[in-house]
Amino acid sequence: MASLIVGGGESLRGSLWIQGSKNAALPMIAAAVLNRGITKIYHCPAISDVDNMLEIMKSLGCCIERTGEYVLIDSSQMDVRDISPEYAASMRSSVFLMGALLGRFGEVSLPYPGGCVIGKRPIDMHLAAFERMNIRVQVTGDRIFCSTDHMAGSGHRLRYPSVGATENIILASVLAPGQTVIKNAAKEPEVIELCLLLNKMGADIHGMGTGNITIYGVSTLHDAVFSLVSDRIVAATYLAAAAATAGDVEVRGVWAHDLKTVLQVLAEMGCGIIVRNKRVRVIGPYMLSCVDSIYTHPFPGFPTDMQSQIMACLSRARGISRLTETVFEDRFKTAGELKKMGADILIENHTAVIRGVECLKGTCVKAWDLRGTAALVIAGLMAEGDTVISDSIYIRRGYEDICADLKKLGARIEERKTG
């Protein structure tokens, strides 16, 4: 186990290059199953979720080469279709391998996937889509079995623009005969990145980013080299930290378009925003202003993965803010920890009503999930005294080295091993 010790009272200043995207890397690693050869991914983040995904790939028979610059995956000799409970139970992104293994072998077996405890994240849309592609789905206990003798392209209208369901359908269908159409598809930048990689391998995918994606099945894919986009949530987290500490931080290597709704909220909170090429700079005011209403939504709406961090910022903003979670029903656990620091937050159904306070006090708090840990770090940076965040190991799932990054900006933060 590990704890983070965060010292408050420092304004963050400086610039950072942002790591590769976690949410783009994981489905891309799964996509390497499909080409029966070599996939080389540059700018792949050194985080525990990627580590675990690569371990799953090794267990399936892939050869992995990893350097500080790239990850190389050779799937030419893989022959296993059964995903071990050891990895799948703790990592939800293992679900992407369902579509990839079905696309390559026509069968897959895995336990229900895990991940952060932030509410129900059912995969019924994934399984229903597979059944429309002539795939047999059987759920026995806590294990899922899928198989097909002849996968076929088909039409899908998602009741919700799920990123995972969209990506799984894409992975399963690129080698399926015929045409597959996904209506109400997810528009996230990470979905676009997956499609760009697959097209570079020889897939025939159109419409990514529009909400209506069409995939024309091809017979084979080939080797590819790809460079990952930077992580928009990591970038937004550091910009939020700048806002919270009356700081001045520039993040580099990111597209402002991917951060549009976050930047709009930060501007409403009184921040100065400067965009130049692939650089975004946020200058925080002496006192943040409240935001009357924020709703989380799928892209291009405000990202649920930034809800906790913005809640932390608003805990010291002048006035009353309302933050409504529409994506996950149980993502307010961090509010209870912020209240231990003196925050005034009331949860009403799916809305957090945040009354800004004059100051937060450093104390001992507990991390519950990845983004909640980042939120507690931001709160610690704002607080008087030191904040100790226990169970902070979650942060390694999405941030390469948050301590080193924040220290570059002038923060006082360190990790301490416990137990």
Q: What residues fall within each predicted segment?
A:
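Short, structured segments at the rim of ligand-binding sites
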Residues: 1-419
